[in-house]
């Protein structure tokens, strides 16, 4: 890391910020686990919390399930694209469980809170959690997304601090145990508000420029480290293949899983071209997964 590239920070502050954002997402994770109403979140850890730049790039993730890491960032970016930066305000909270945005199933509900400092958008706090019920049928007999349950398009749960009570009513009317759903909703809000509060403490202590440049340095260093490790792998094409017995609907019909990894220099391409086509059962995944 050179001072010319990051004049507002230095290696010491950057390392403090790196550990600081890890601590923030760790506290978000702990608060969610302590306040969630269903065991899928606090026992199975079917959730993820994170901090993201104002462009939606990942700053830090408090991992529950690693499979959400990319989906979280893509979900934040989708919400930014949907509303536009100029239509995102202090007090807003955005929500969706759209499977084609999150890359997952409808039970995974994602809340995103924009973080402002002195009137300027500087980051986002986000929480994806598995609700025990979102309506719909049992997964083992579901063959289309409409059977899975309530679909929540990208929208604002809160607009400039005003909660969308109609949306809450819609959720209550479409789940079997409303108290559980609303309890998990409140737990997720607690998590993202914790992220906002703690991240702003770092910003106020070191200044927004130092925080922004430290985060850029952390990302650059992370990319450099990953590329260095990739260089240690001999150039070539590596392939692996497995299968699932079936998709739960077409019994006995194998579902092939094939992956090809191409390494060239410090770059790696993961090719899923030969993986199975979409199946009738509930094993399909979106690109963000």
What residue ranges belong to the model's regions?
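Extended active-site and interfacial segments that coordinate phosphate-rich ligands
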Residues: 65-79, 113, 125-159, 273-289
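Short, basic/aromatic recognition patches
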Residues: 20-44, 80-84, 96-102
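A short, hydrophobic, proline-anchored segment that marks a local hinge/packing element in signaling
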Residues: 108-118, 126, 261-262
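Accessory "access/gating" subregions that flank catalytic or transport cores
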Residues: 197-277
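Regulatory sensory and allosteric helical modules in signal-transduction proteins
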Residues: 54-61, 73-98
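Mobile "lid/hinge" segments at catalytic clefts and subdomain interfaces of large enzymes
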Residues: 118-201
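Glycine- and acidic
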Residues: 8-12, 32, 60-62, 179-181, ...
């Amino acid at each position: 890391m050179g001072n010319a590239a990051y004049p507002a920070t230095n290696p010491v502050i950057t390392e403090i910020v790196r550990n600081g954002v890890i601590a923030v997402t760790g506290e978000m994770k702990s608060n969610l686990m302590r306040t969630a109403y269903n065991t899928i979140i606090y026992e199975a850890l079917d959730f993820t919390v994170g901090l993201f730049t104002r462009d939606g790039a990942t700053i830090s993730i408090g991992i529950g399930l690693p499979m959400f890491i990319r989906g979280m960032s893509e979900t934040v970016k989708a919400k930014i694209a949907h509303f536009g930066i100029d239509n995102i305000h202090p007090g807003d909270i955005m929500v969706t469980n759209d499977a084609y945005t999150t890359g997952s199933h409808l039970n995974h509900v994602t809340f995103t809170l924009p973080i402002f400092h002195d009137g300027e958008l500087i980051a986002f706090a986000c929480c994806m959690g598995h609700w025990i019920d979102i309506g719909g049928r049992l997964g083992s007999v579901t063959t289309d997304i409409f059977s899975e349950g309530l679909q929540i398009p990208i929208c604002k749960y809160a607009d400039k601090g005003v909660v969308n009570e109609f949306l809450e009513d819609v959720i209550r009317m479409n789940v079997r145990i409303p108290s559980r759903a609303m309890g998990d909703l409140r737990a997720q809000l607690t998590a993202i508000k914790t992220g906002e509060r703690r991240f702003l403490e770092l910003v106020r202590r070191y200044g927004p420029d130092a925080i922004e440049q430290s985060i850029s340095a952390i990302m650059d260093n992370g990319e450099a480290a990953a590329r260095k490790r990739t260089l240690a792998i001999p150039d070539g094409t590596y392939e692996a293949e497995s299968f699932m017995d079936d998709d739960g609907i077409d019994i006995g019909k194998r579902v092939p899983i094939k992956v090809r990894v191409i390494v060239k220099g410090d770059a790696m391409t993961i090719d899923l071209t030969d993986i199975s086509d979409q199946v009738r059962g509930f094993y399909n995944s979106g690109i963000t997964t």
